[in-house]
Amino acid sequence: MNAPLHPLKQPSMLRQLLATEAAGGVLLMFTAALAIIIANSPWASAYQHLLHLPVGPVLTDKLGPMTVHMWINDGLMAIFFLLVGLEIKRELVDGRLASWEQRRLPALPALMGMAVPALIYLAVSRGELGLAGGWAIPAATDIAFAVGALALLGKHAPLSLKVMLVSVAIIDDMGAVAIIAVFYTSSINLLALAGAAGIVAVLLAFNRLRVVALWPYLIGVAALWYVTLLSGVHATIAGVVGALLIPYSAGSGAEREASPLLKLEHGLAPWVGFLIVPAFGFANAGVSFGDLGWSDIFAPLPLAIALGLLLGKQLGVFAGVLLAVKSGLASKPRGASWLQIYGVAMLCGIGFTMSLFIGELAFPGQPEKIDAAKIGILLGSLLSAVIACVILRFAPKQAD
């Protein structure tokens, strides 16, 4: 995930961030590939047994025993979303999205890059019973994978494009969080939700009292995660909400460096990048291709997702940039050709982590649909990555 920085003033720190993202992205690629290999090997049953092994206490009667898979998706991914929330708050306060001028270029591509894939998904899956709930699966971009692929290209993409990609992905994350909270929430436990509101009030009070010690906020976020789990709202949302309530001092100097938010972000980033996200990839990417035929690949669900990622993302993001620049709303990224911008738009079609996560939420208790969704996600993401890398490798370096 993103390290604290001010990208316009400290480009060298952005390069350091991209190097970290690239390493995490490569590790994610490795664990996802490993999961696919194991799922198609004699160890497939052992892999499934491990994921569904009950571990630890029963947290809620509704969920029952917590399996390894559930701890990763509901527990560790809450920490992932906590880091996402920390990044969003920092970027909005004094980062890439601190001013309206900085928000103009990535905002429209990010929004169109979510809307167009969803519309393509709905158009392709139209009339198919039980598939409408998966409309958000191709709407997300995997920042670790995308930045990792971009970093592997070295100097074939200017820094301005890397800033644009990360900025679009941050707004994309904000949209994904909102989608999960609004559209993938089950029946609500009002008592637990009231408890969550009470914890939020306590965290707000800590802010007003200028509490700078980190541990009260960590306890509060952990409690918020548990009551959110009980409430019926997906528990990962607690990570984002908790992050937004952790204090952050804008500007520069010792006060900023001492901010609880910055301390926590620095502490979480390596764990999320090198443990949590790769673990999620390993736990969720494994799908068997043993009996896979062309009819399975071109079935409505995987086809809708693959086309949403491959076509929808590139069309939405590129059209958003083109519209923002031609209308005078924003300036074209410095030193980038339109072909390079198109390549980055194509790169946004890598929707791995968040798409897999939303797929699990869209089809709960439907393993066949989840596996079909995984096929579409893998196919769309892989094609997007390969085509984008070819475009960016051979695109002219000078601006058009």
Curated annotation (Swiss-Prot):
Reaction equations catalysed: Na(+)(in) + 2 H(+)(out) = Na(+)(out) + 2 H(+)(in)
One term of GO molecular function: sodium:proton antiporter activity
Pfam families: Na_H_antiport_1
Top-rank taxon: Bacteria
Topology in membrane: Multi-pass membrane protein
InterPro entries: Na/H_antiporter_dom_sf (IPR023171), NhaA (IPR004670)
Entry GO CC: plasma membrane
TM stretches of this protein: 18-38, 68-88, 105-125, 133-153, 163-183, 186-206, 211-231, 232-252, 267-287, 305-325, 338-358, 372-392
Primary localization: membrane
Entry keywords, A to Z: Antiport, Cell inner membrane, Cell membrane, Ion transport, Membrane, Sodium, Sodium transport, Transmembrane, Transmembrane helix, Transport
Biological processes annotated in GO: regulation of pH
Keyword Ion transport in record: yes
Subcellular compartments: Cell inner membrane
Function recorded in the entry: Na(+)/H(+) antiporter that extrudes sodium in exchange for external protons.
Protein family: Belongs to the NhaA Na(+)/H(+) (TC 2.A.33) antiporter family.
Name listed for the protein in its UniProt record: Na(+)/H(+) antiporter NhaA
Higher taxonomy: Bacteria, Pseudomonadati, Pseudomonadota, Gammaproteobacteria, Pseudomonadales
